[in-house]
Every structure is written in C-alpha cells, then in structure tokens.
Amino acid sequence: MRCLLLLLLVPVPGAKVFERCEWARLLKRNGMSNYRGISLADWVCLSQWESSYNTRATNRNTDGSTDYGIFQINSRWWCDNGQTPTSNACGISCSALLTDDVGAAIICAKHVVRDPNGIGAWVAWKRHCQGQDLSSYVAGCGV
C-alpha cells in the first residue's frame, strides 16, 4: 500500500497549454512573425482554433489520419504515427509534435506553409481566421 501511495504522489507530466501572449512571444522568437507573409496574429488565431494552445492535442479524422500538437499537424501528409500511410513531408514522428518543446512543431508548420496551400492547409484558419480582424490575438502581448 505504501508503494501505491508513493506512485500517486509522483507528478505526471501534463500537456503544456500556453497562454495567448506567451504563445505569441514564443512564435515571434522563433521567426514566425511574417514568415512567408503570414502574420503573427494568423499563427496565434490558427493555434487557438486548432488546439486551444495545447501541445498534446490530438484529433482523429474521418479518413483515419490524426492531427497532432499545437498546430494539429496531420499524419497523412506531414508526420509518421506508425499507423497511417504517410508522406511524412516533415520527416518526423508525430509524437515529436506532442512535446512541450515546440521546436519540431514550429519547424514542421514552416514546412507546411511552404506547400502550395500555404496556411490554407489548416481548415480552422480558413473558417475562423482568414479575412478577419485578428488584432485581438496579439493585443497586449508586446509583440
């Protein structure tokens, strides 16, 4: 029983859920502001609608693929989850997109927007961000 109690007290790492401004500043530090003409506000909006800034977000799609991480990067095209047939255009394991170190996710997102679809590859961006006033996504963030 004592071992069980000790196991219950060991903290289990949870998802990193960024605050809006914390995420905006991190994106800026990583060269995402106006990357390929995409504003920082667009990236913050996209992340809000795709994952609510949650690094461990996953979503299963009707085609059997899965979206991973804060940018919800798809396993059919961009990463390898070992289950879905994939192009793995980012050359990474999908699990690398689920860590609190978002470096791999940012590099892969940059790769995605170099594709002809650009930021339009994200349905949530098209539905919620495209053509909108996005200033509120970076307001008060000092970016």
UniProtKB/Swiss-Prot annotation:
Its main location: secreted. Lysozyme C is capable of both hydrolysis and transglycosylation; it also shows a slight esterase activity. It acts rapidly on both peptide-substituted and unsubstituted peptidoglycan, and slowly on chitin oligosaccharides. GO terms for cellular component: extracellular region. Its EC number is 3.2.1.17. Belongs to the glycosyl hydrolase 22 family. It comes from the Eukaryota. The keyword Signal applies. Disulfide bonds join C21-C141, C45-C129, C79-C94, C90-C108. The keyword Secreted applies. Residues 16-143 form the C-type lysozyme domain. The active site is at E50, D67. It catalyses: Hydrolysis of (1->4)-beta-linkages between N-acetylmuramic acid and N-acetyl-D-glucosamine residues in a peptidoglycan and between N-acetyl-D-glucosamine residues in chitodextrins. It is found in: Secreted. GO terms for molecular function: lysozyme activity. SUPFAM superfamilies: Lysozyme-like. InterPro entries: Glyco_hydro_22, Glyco_hydro_22_lys, Lysozyme-like_dom_sf. One of its GO terms (biological process) is defense response to bacterium. Keywords: Antimicrobial, Bacteriolytic enzyme, Disulfide bond, Glycosidase, Hydrolase, Secreted, Signal. It is an enzyme of class 3 (hydrolase). Lysozymes have primarily a bacteriolytic function; those in tissues and body fluids are associated with the monocyte-macrophage system and enhance the activity of immunoagents. This is Lysozyme C. Monomer. SMART domains: LYZ1 (SM00263). Residues 1-15 form the signal peptide.
